[in-house]
Amino acid sequence: ATTEIYTLSLHDALPILLLLWPLLIVMAILIKIKMPGGPAFFTQKRVGKNGKLFTCHKFRSMTVKHSGSTVSVAGDSRITPLGATLRHYKIDELPGLWDVMIGNMSFVGPRPDVPGYADRLEGDNRIVLKLRPGITGPATLKYRLEDEMISEYVAQKQKEGDIRTAQEIAEEFNDRVIYPDKVRINKYYYEHYSFIKDIQMIFCTVLGKNMKYNNEII
């Protein structure tokens, strides 16, 4: 399964990059204008296939100086107005096509974790590390509005009188609910790989549509 994913990704990434390069250039210029004082691209070490670290590329969506937390919520002060738009429409992920082209990522697969989260994988859960990380995937589709979901949870907890900071509440919800569910979904993806489902996920990502996967709507 992973060989098929890699072949599809490597062969298709270059023509897509060539097709989208004008958009990538425009986005990079827009980021430099609207978010001065920092680079257009955000790079970070992520955990790839077999636990190997690689440099992941995205368009920058946050201010240059922000906390190191990887959990964000809708309306997060670290996210700029332009960055919020890029994230909502997943445009910030387009530079990941470079990572696909050089073989570090696939079009479809689990999102690459930062080392701290990947280190939490134990037992059978570690099989997800056998997969090449993807720009999209079943967990990505299910949690495409993750920032908004976390924001709603934070607002509800604060309404109930929770005195923790918004970031602390967000991280607790992510660690307790969202991350374990993503691992569950990615394990199923590994164990029940389908090339047809991969194609369907790519189309659903581009078109913003939902699909049925493992008896749930993602």
Predicted regions mapped to residue ranges:
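Short, exposed "boundary/linker" segments that immediately precede the start
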Residues: 1-7
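A hydrophobic, helix-centered structural microdomain
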Residues: 8-64, 189-218
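Residue-level signal for cytosolic alpha-helical hairpin/rod architecture
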Residues: 11, 79-82, 184
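Hydrophobic structural segments characteristic of membrane proteins
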Residues: 39, 101-218
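Cytosolic-biased juxtamembrane loops and peripheral soluble domains of multi-pass membrane proteins
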Residues: 63-85, 114-121, 152-153
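Short, well-ordered beta-strand elements within core beta-sheets of diverse protein domains
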Residues: 82-89, 186-191
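Periplasmic N-terminal gating module of Gram-negative TonB-dependent outer-membrane receptors
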Residues: 90-94
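Gly/Thr-rich phosphate-binding loop signature of adenosyl cofactor/nucleotide-binding cores
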Residues: 97
